[in-house]
């Protein structure tokens, strides 16, 4: 008489530590403020006041703005990089890093008010994440761009305008928190850049998205940029999830 088949071995008890997926870290909130066209001085004063008043519980913020024409010179900037003193465009000395740059209509400016200590970010890491967000934003409009060692900002990677600067970046860190931020040239009058050595580089070409063939408007690019910035900050925001129409109109 054949013997009964052996009973199957009991399955090994699962390793509790290996079988329970860890909870993902909670995303830190980011408040997005759409400020429309705002004078530079007003934003500069407000950024410093916000940073001085914030507490460990203050949410990080991104301010999206378009400035009337203005040159800004970083705290270690050389005034000699302003080549035309009587250009009619005001010059504001500020406390960010970097040299001289130009802000004006048709350019997106995004200010990042971020608690680096709470996010456990080094300054270099934050700069890299901002640059990646800009590169991804431009790629969404079929524009290839790249960072350049030793020269913060984003530069055209190929074509007849290879090496031209399309986005600038400058930050200030106070009490472990950042302010100032970045600018992306969408569709603007580029002539004011001819009156300066952009970011301190003589002869550096500055370009905008429109000159490279991109037809997206300011608001569309700004929305794309904000979403990429938040993704790289590992944050979450109600404003970034709004429908397109609501996002365009959510100006504070």
Curated annotation (Swiss-Prot):
EC number: 2.3.1.181
Any one GO molecular function term: lipoyl(octanoyl) transferase activity
Marked site positions, Lowers pKa of active site Cys: 165
Residues of the BPL/LPL catalytic domain: 56-237
Domain of life per record: Bacteria
Keyword Ligase (UniProt): no
Active site: 199
Key word Ribosomal protein present: no
InterPro entries: aa-tRNA-synth_II/BPL/LPL (IPR045864), BPL_LPL_catalytic (IPR004143), Octanoyltransferase (IPR000544), Octanoyltransferase_CS (IPR020605)
Catalytic activity: octanoyl-[ACP] + L-lysyl-[protein] = N(6)-octanoyl-L-lysyl-[protein] + holo-[ACP] + H(+)
Subcellular compartments: Cytoplasm
Enzyme class: transferase
Metabolic or biological pathway: Protein modification; protein lipoylation via endogenous pathway; protein N(6)-(lipoyl)lysine from octanoyl-[acyl-carrier-protein]: step 1/2
Biased composition (Low complexity): 1-21
Entry keywords, A to Z: Acyltransferase, Cytoplasm, Transferase
Residues the entry annotates as binding substrate: 96-103, 168-170, 181-183
Gene Ontology annotations of biological process type: protein modification process
NCBIfam families listed in its UniProt record: lipB, PRK14342.1, PRK14343.1
Protein task: Catalyzes the transfer of endogenously produced octanoic acid from octanoyl-acyl-carrier-protein onto the lipoyl domains of lipoate-dependent enzymes. Lipoyl-ACP can also act as a substrate although octanoyl-ACP is likely to be the physiological substrate.
Family: Belongs to the LipB family.
HAMAP family tied to this protein: LipB (MF_00013)
Name of the featured protein: Octanoyltransferase
Lineage, top ranks: Bacteria, Pseudomonadati, Pseudomonadota, Betaproteobacteria, Burkholderiales
Gene: lipB
């Amino acid at each position: 008489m054949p013997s009964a088949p052996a009973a199957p071995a009991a399955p090994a008890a699962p390793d509790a530590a290996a079988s329970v997926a860890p909870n993902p870290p909670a995303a830190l909130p980011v408040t997005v403020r759409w400020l429309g066209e705002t004078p530079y001085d007003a934003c500069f004063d407000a950024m410093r006041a916000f940073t001085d008043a914030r507490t460990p519980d203050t949410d990080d913020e991104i301010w999206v703005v378009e400035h009337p024409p203005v040159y800004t010179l970083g705290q270690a900037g050389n005034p000699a990089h302003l080549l035309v003193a009587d250009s009619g465009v005001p010059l504001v000395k500020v406390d960010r890093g970097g040299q001289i740059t130009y802000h004006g209509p048709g350019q997106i400016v995004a200010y990042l008010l971020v608690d680096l200590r709470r996010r456990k970010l080094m300054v270099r890491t934050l700069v890299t994440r901002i640059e990646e967000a800009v590169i991804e934003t431009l790629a969404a409009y079929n524009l290839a761009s790249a960072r350049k060692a030793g020269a913060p900002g984003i530069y055209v990677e190929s074509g007849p305008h290879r090496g031209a600067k399309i986005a600038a970046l400058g930050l200030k860190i106070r009490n472990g928190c950042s302010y100032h931020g970045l600018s992306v040239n969408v569709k603007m009058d580029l002539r004011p850049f001819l009156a300066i050595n952009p970011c301190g580089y003589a002869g550096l070409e500055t370009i905008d998205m429109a000159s490279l063939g991109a037809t997206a408007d300011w608001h569309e690019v700004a929305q794309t940029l904000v979403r990429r910035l938040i993704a790289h900050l590992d944050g979450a925001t109600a404003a970034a999830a709004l429908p397109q129409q609501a996002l365009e109109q959510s100006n504070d």
